[in-house]
Structures are given as C-alpha cells and as structure tokens.
Amino acid sequence: MVKISLILPLLVLLTLSLTLAPCSCIAQAISKTADGFDLPVAPPMGAGFYKSRGFRSGGHLGEDWVTDGGSAKGFRQPVHAIGNGIVVLARDIHVAWGNVVIIRHAWIENRQIHFADSLYAHLDKINVREGQQVGKGQQLGTIGTNHGMYPPHLHFEIHKDLGIGVNHAAGTRDLRSYWLPTDFVLARRHLAGGGRNVPTPAANFLLPTTEHPWYLGRFWHSPKKSTHPKSSKSSASHRSSSTSQKHSSSNKWKVNRYTDP
C-alpha cells in the first residue's frame, strides 16, 4: 500500500500543474531607461494618499495605498507608472488579484543596467496593453476593488525577480526577490542615463487558470469586516487619517474569502 505521505506531494504537484499556465506575455523588446521613479498614486510623492499596509516578508509582499479620509474616496482614482518601462502584463487575473498591470523597468545605477518589475493590482480599469511603452507618470488604470472583493485600494509591488509575475510561489517571499516599494522609489527619485534604448528581457510568467491552491490554502479565511490591519505611516511621511476613517466603506465593499495577496 502506497503511503499517504508519498501521495500528497504528488497530488499537490498535479494540482499546481493544472491550475497554472505559462504566459509568454512579451518577447524581448527595446525600452527606454528610467530617469527616476515616482510613487504610483498622486505622483510624484502621493499627496492625499497614505500607506495602509506595508511589506512583510513571508506575508504581504507589497504595499496598499488608499486615500486620506477613507478608502471609498480613492475608488477610480488614477494609477500611474512609477517610471519609464514596457507593459509586460495587463489583464484580469481573477482570484485574489483582479485587474493587474506589470511594467518592466530598466535603469542605470553604478554604471550598470538593472531591471525590476512594478505591479499594480485590483484595478477598476486598465488603460494600457501588453507590449506598450509607457513613460513615468503615465496613467495605467484606476483604483478598484477586485470586482467588489476588497475596499478600494491599490496593491503595489516591486520585484527583483523578473519571473514572479502574479505567482508569489515563483520566488523567495522576502527581500531577495522583492524591493520595499516606497524605499525603492525614494532612493531613485532622479537617475542619470534616462531615456536610453536598451534590450529588455522577455516576460514568461505562470498565471492561474482557475482558483490556484496558493489562494485557497494559505490565504483562505472567513469573511471579516476589513482585510486591512491598522495603518502605519510610510517613510515618505504620508499623512494618515484616524482609525475610524480607514476603510469606512467596508460595509459597502464586499470582503470575500481571499485576503489581499
């Protein structure tokens, strides 16, 4: 009789293979190097927004941005590219993500070319297409709720590992694979060598095809009033409103069985 301990890993691998599909989103392309980076809401420095939830290794691998005075006021507010780059993903991923845009950036630092992906999730609308060149500050879409799953906010990540896409299991869940988003921007507000044409690596991501077990296992939870803990002020000294104001519309926006990625 085959031991259960041997069967379970095989079942997990089979399930993963059935619920993830490769996406050759764009081939290698030429894009312009960044001349600096801004925050993705109310650029350059996010005036009128605050960071309601920050990065935590092994947990929340990005930042959540909402408007001062309550998340409802941020619904359908513009979301902007943090810097020059090329759109490598722009589609509705469903599950815990909803509408997602990922931009691949190149920049010159210490005389070397570096690359990173910026991710913008839960959008209400997407205004760009895959393969499109974008400039710093260009509108990518609008703040949304992931089809009513969350209170309105922008989930924002920056990836060192260009293979992650929307599959957090593709990299280490810590600063080996991710940048602290606000710190990344503040350290690179102005860069030399912007506007140069450089070859950008192709984007080959694994995307969920149905309801990936990564969401249904680790992130399953019972419905709560809000998926967001108490806010913390960002290093950019963004204003924060009182606890009573944060996500004041949580009764209006349905909070589903998923937590924010």
State where each predicted segment sits:
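Small beta-barrel nucleic-acid-binding modules, principally OB-folds
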Residues: 59-72, 116-118, 122, 163-172
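Zn2+-dependent peptidoglycan hydrolase active-site motif and core
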Residues: 74-76, 82-127, 152-157
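Conserved, short, structured surface segments that act as functional micro-motifs
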Residues: 101-105, 132-205
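Short, flexible loop/turn elements at secondary-structure junctions
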Residues: 43, 55, 69, 107, ...
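Bacterial N-terminal signal peptides
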Residues: 8-21
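Positively charged n-region of N-terminal signal peptides that target proteins for export
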Residues: 1-6
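Long, low-complexity, intrinsically disordered segments
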Residues: 234-261
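Surface-exposed, glycine-biased beta-strand/turn segments
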Residues: 23-99, 136, 145, 180-225, ...
